[in-house]
């Protein structure tokens, strides 16, 4: 069919490849949901808030007299809880006799293990203000939902609330999320002390490697800590 020239041989090979290409089934298309999940995975971890950003959000909530949001923000920073655990806190988890305690213990949804966290004076004050202003008939949860068929604020609603805090402070919303709240105090503790084991305990990680990844610790961080030690 083809002559014996070099051009004829190349044409023959190309023709075989084209036949094979048409006979070969096309790879299945990636569903849109998988694409979105892949995008989310490539975005990376959300950054912790810096102290000046914490104060910017806090002052804004105080000026606007947003008692619920101020209490939620302060407690999110102090407790270092995952969003699902934060929104499902009950009043009796954090208060006794109408007064907010300085420490609380709950059972985590994800792991089923108990966890203790501190409630600092500033957070206690904002929580006390919110509990005093919160309607008593709204159920047992610290942050009851405004939607009648939901007992408390959902994790999805919490994510939208956090987005509003970030946006209201004039920050880039793509860089922050609910995990920013969980990471903020832990990151500051690590930067000030270098005590990775303490941060691991506070975040309730079973493996130290998880804490390293969660904090995003890099070689530069290790070198910075090393430079602070003289022998």
For the regions a language model picked out, list residue spans one by one.
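Conserved catalytic core of the tyrosine transesterase superfamily
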Residues: 2-3, 7-231
């Amino acid at each position: 069919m083809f002559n014996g020239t070099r051009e004829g041989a190349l044409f023959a090979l190309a023709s075989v490849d084209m036949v094979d290409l048409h006979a070969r089934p096309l790879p299945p298309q990636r569903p849109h949901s998988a694409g979105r999940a892949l995008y989310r995975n490539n975005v990376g971890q959300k950054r912790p808030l810096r102290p000046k950003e914490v104060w910017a959000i806090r002052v804004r909530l105080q000026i606007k007299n947003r008692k619920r949001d101020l209490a939620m923000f302060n407690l999110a920073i102090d407790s270092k809880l995952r969003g699902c655990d934060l929104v499902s806190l009950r009043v009796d988890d954090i208060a006794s006799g109408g007064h907010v305690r300085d420490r609380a213990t709950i059972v985590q949804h994800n792991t089923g293990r108990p966890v203790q966290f501190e409630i600092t004076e500033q957070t206690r004050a904002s929580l006390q203000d919110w509990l005093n202003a919160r309607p008593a008939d709204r159920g047992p949860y610290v942050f009851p939902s405004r939607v009648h068929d939901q007992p408390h604020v959902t994790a999805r609603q919490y994510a939208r609330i956090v987005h509003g805090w970030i946006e209201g402070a004039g920050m880039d919303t793509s860089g922050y999320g609910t995990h920013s709240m969980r990471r903020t105090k832990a990151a500051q503790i690590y930067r000030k002390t270098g005590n990775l084991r303490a941060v691991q305990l506070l975040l309730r990680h079973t493996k130290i490697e998880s804490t390293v990844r969660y904090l995003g610790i890099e070689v530069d961080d290790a070198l910075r800590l090393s430079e602070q030690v003289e022998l």
